[in-house]
Amino acid sequence: RKKLGNDYNYIVLDAQNIPFKNHFFDTVIANHVLFYLQDLNLGLLEISRVLKDYGIFYCTTYGKNHMKEITEIVHNFDSRIQLSNNNLVEHFGLENGETLLSPYFKQIELKRYDDYLIVDDAKALMNYIMSCHGNQKEYLGYRLKEFQAHLEKIIDENNGIKITKDCGLFICRK
C-alpha cells in the first residue's frame, strides 16, 4: 500500500473461479502463474470475462531456454535428475502463449525480456537447484558435497556461470 498509494488495489485469487461480475476490472495481471492452472482455458475465459471491454491483461511466462544452463549442468552430473516434474512452458510459455491467448483476446503483443544471470556462488546455486520441484533431492541428497565441488569447479573454470533468462510479457486487449 505504501508503494502503490490509494489509487490501486490488488487481490490474490483463483483464476479459474474469479468471484467478480462481468467487465469489472480495468487490468488483470498474472505473473508467472498461468502454467500452473489445472484448466488454462477456464482461467483465460474467467480473466476475459471480468475484464472491461477496454481492459488489459498482462501475463508473464518463461520460454523453453529459461535457465537451460542449470539443466545442462545437473544432467551432466547425473542424467537421471529432472528439476521439474512438469514442463511448464509446454502448458503456457513464450512459444505457445499467443496461440493459447488468441481465442480470448483480439490484440496480443509479446515483449521479450533479454537478460541473463552470472552466478559465482556454488552454494547459492546448489540451494536453488535443491528447491526445484523435481527429483533432484533423491539423486543429490547424499552427494551434496560432491555436487557443490562440481559447481565450484565449473564456476572457477569459467569465472562464473552465465545463465539464460528467457522470459517475456504478453500484453492482451479484448
List each model region and its residues.
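A short SAM/SAH-binding and catalytic strip from SAM-dependent methyltransferases
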Residues: 26-41, 61-63
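Conserved class I S-adenosyl-L-methionine
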Residues: 56-83
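Short conserved AdoMet
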Residues: 5, 38, 52, 102, ...
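A short glycine-rich, Lys/Arg-flanked "PGG" loop and its adjoining helix->strand segment in the class I
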Residues: 41-56
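Conserved Class I S-adenosyl-L-methionine
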Residues: 88-174
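Conserved residues in the N-terminal Rossmann fold of short-chain dehydrogenase/reductase
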Residues: 12
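Short, conserved SAM-binding/catalytic segment
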Residues: 1-8
